[in-house]
Amino acid sequence: MMLKFIKSIFKTPSDRIIANLKSKIQQVHSAESSLAKLSNIELRNKTSEFKARLANNEPIDNIQYEAFAVVREAAKRTIGIQHYDEQLIGGILLHQGKVIEMSTGEGKTLVATLPSYLNALMGKGVHVVTVNDYLAQRDSDWMGTIHRFLDITVGCITSNTNEHARKIAYNSDITYITNNELGFDFLRDNMQFTNQSKVQRGCNYAIIDEIDSILIDEARTPLIISGPVSDNTSLYPIINKLITKLNKDDYEMDEKLRNVTLTDLGINKLETMLAEINILAPNSNSLYDFENMHLIHYINQSLKAHTLFRRNVDYLVKNGKVIIIDEFTGRTMDSRRYSEGLHQALEAKEKVEIQNENQTLASITFQNYFRMYTKLSGMTGTAMTEATELKEIYDLDVVTVPTHNPVQRIDYDDEIYSTKKDKYSAIIQLIQECYSKGQPVLVGTVSIEKSEELSKLLHSKKIPHNVLNAKHHDKEASIIAQAGRIKAITIATNMAGRGTDIMLGGNAEMLVDQSNLTEEEYQEKLKITKMQIEQEKEQVINAGGLFVIGTERHESRRIDNQLRGRCGRQGDPGQTKFFLSLEDDLMRIFASDRVTNILRTIGLKDGEAIHHPLINRSLATAQQKIEAQNYEIRKNLLKYDNVMNDQRKVIYEQRNEAISSDNVNEILHNLTEELIVETVHKFIPPKSYKEDWNIHGLVKEYHHIFNVKLQLDSIEATDSSLKVIEYLTKTAFDIYKQQEQDYSAKSANEAIKHIFIKTLDQTWKEHLYTLDHLKQGISLRAYGQKDPLNEYKREAFDLFKQMLLHLKYLFIQRVARLHIDLASSPKSTSSLLETSDNNLKSKIITENSMAHKYFGKISRNQLCPCNSGKKFKHCHGALK
């Protein structure tokens, strides 16, 4: 009571912002009064009028309220829905680049039509981002009706959209798309060889639905495009078999940090088993001998697969493949694989086909991707718990928008039991009570395993129900849409159909099958169904509305709030209650020993529940600790990714410059001049005496780079390094001029551009591989009293400089050996690029033989003499 009294006196920042905006809403109503008289064509023509005003440099905010009024009127005429005042407030806040928190059922999808229309008038594109293909398609079809009526083009991109259709969709005024498709299209675009092959047109304005899920839950996992490497996978099943023979004394597991390590007993046992099957190196009996170090990687990953990763919790097996389950949404992530051999270890554990390990070709986090947008905003039902992170990472303010009708949902206190068995018995009893009076129930679980366990108990009681988890995700929308019908019992994992409202009495549109009906028959049947649903809705309301049951607390308070928010939409009644046990993961791993000891001391009897403020406070504290821990992980990931992001910007900028350039001679000449200066200074140090010059070394090096034998006399006749540089530069440029004469300037330019882009991609890919390895072991620097992040920054920068040097060296070396056989192939760009590729492949052999000829006998672990900074075996010695 005291808290409510204080809140009534001291308004929150959100309250003050909303109060200021309420006066602005009147401007929308004023503008709308004249619009109602317009014909459809006249209303549509307002779009071209707005565009003309913006083209004359009128500020977009000047037309905001009139544009909102146009959208409101168009929505009324097309889909029969009019924006509430609260939705207009939400639209204003989204246009301002804020995150709005709106309760379930308050019409966030409709709100997005306001700022998306307004900003689409600028002609730079608006992306409305959703969490899955179904919602992207649904919103595009439904809300797109409003936009198309107003002569605004609308596109939709899902995982099944082809390249041509993607380009058309991105060029639309408004594009509905998932976050994954956006990120992967960005990475793919930066692997294309021409601007025409790219599909995106830049990052202007994005409205992110379920923004907390995308920018927070998924921020820990970077988007990666990878390619297979020819690593040996034969060891995974062998090591897997040995790991199954270990027991709990052979390893120590920390569930809180999700880490597992072998004990001395486990190491000894493994060494014995490895020796018996002749896996250890000859004359070696220790796993940690240098010759056996590679085995540790396989052992660690297999141990993790068996102890930390559970089937139907962290992953599922479908059609002979291990598929990751998103821990936050409960959905499958079909296109993703665990890195560093973990996925292969899981495949060995589940005895399915083991695929090769992958190497990163391109990578970006959602954090860095969405920060590229000129303007960003978002919507969700639960954002206030993450307001600090959204502000610190993305500079986004969160504002809570009031509900249109007062919330009538009742949230009961948690019930805590000593065992899972007692907890499930209480849940089943409550479900039976609700079922007997016709009250619909939604049961939220944290994993597939738990949802199927509960389903078996309901089957044993002969209670009909639906199960919604990653195994049945294809029926997600239809199951959730009907979860508000009389006697409907629905068990769902975290996914819980976010984005699909649970309507009391059911959803008429989804109940009527239109496939075999004429439009007239469909409308008639829909009318009858809606009347039946209205009657059913009254019965459900009288029974108490939808009852949401939580079977355990999640690690994040936000996900608990999302589950509660499934009921009580638009002022409907609803009830929620969480059932917990001391055996739940959250209680077992994170709750304090003090709480557990108190409960053990109390000595709960079988089937007896406890309600205690200390328990609720302890749970809230445990959740806050986990949220803080996950926030630190995300912040840390961003700090490391920022290092790569700066480098990524340089590479992508250089790549795009080359692709867009009609003439790459400037790039070629600049890099040639830089390389020649560096090479000359290596053999003729600045301000050195002539007798200290290493002319023989310089001649060999120049021949290795440009495939040209210099006359010693020409260099010996000069008296300064500057003149040597001029002579060598002229010689190199003469090579390029000769190529233009031999093949034509256009053909040579196309081939050189192709060589530059391919060489850039190759060196960048190798650099990412090196950074991956650097990142894996960098945390160990802390033991040497060094900051791992600073060490990573320093070494990553050094590696980047070495990569740029290697790029320069390899590119010029390849151009100098360019040969296009015009006699045997037509003079077209496509065939020219193909010929250029073939020449590059054949040239590699030449490079390698030259490397051994001029470098002599070199250890494979020595640094390559070409100054790339790489080991010889990874550079010129890699092609042996």
Curated annotation (Swiss-Prot):
Keywords, comma-separated and alphabetical: ATP-binding, Cell inner membrane, Cell membrane, Cytoplasm, Membrane, Metal-binding, Nucleotide-binding, Protein transport, Translocase, Translocation, Transport, Zinc
Keyword Nucleotide-binding: yes
Cofactor(s) the protein requires to work: Zn(2+)
Pfam families, per database record: P-loop_SecA, SEC-C, SecA_DEAD, SecA_PP_bind, SecA_SW
Physiological role: Part of the Sec protein translocase complex. Interacts with the SecYEG preprotein conducting channel. Has a central role in coupling the hydrolysis of ATP to the transfer of proteins into and across the cell membrane, serving both as a receptor for the preprotein-SecB complex and as an ATP-driven molecular motor driving the stepwise translocation of polypeptide chains across the membrane.
GO biological process annotation, one example: intracellular protein transmembrane transport
Binding-site residues, Zn(2+): C864, C866, C875, H876
Subcellular location: Cell inner membrane; Cytoplasm
Single GO MF descriptor: ATP binding
SMART domains: SecA_DEAD (SM00957), SecA_PP_bind (SM00958)
The name this protein goes by in its record: Protein translocase subunit SecA
Catalysed reactions, as listed in the record: ATP + H2O + cellular proteinSide 1 = ADP + phosphate + cellular proteinSide 2
InterPro entries with a match to the protein in the record: Helicase_ATP-bd (IPR014001), Helicase_C-like (IPR001650), P-loop_NTPase (IPR027417), SEC_C_motif (IPR004027), SecA (IPR000185), SecA_CS (IPR020937), SecA_DEAD (IPR011115), SecA_motor_DEAD (IPR014018)
Source organism per UniProt: Orientia tsutsugamushi (strain Boryong)
Enzyme Commission code: 7.4.2.8
Family per similarity comment: Belongs to the SecA family.
Cellular component, GO annotation: cell envelope Sec protein transport complex; cytosol; plasma membrane
PROSITE patterns: SECA, SECA_MOTOR_DEAD
Positions that bind ATP: Q87, G105, E106, G107, K108, T109, D501
Subunit (UniProt): Monomer and homodimer. Part of the essential Sec protein translocation apparatus which comprises SecA, SecYEG and auxiliary proteins SecDF-YajC and YidC.
Source domain of life: Bacteria
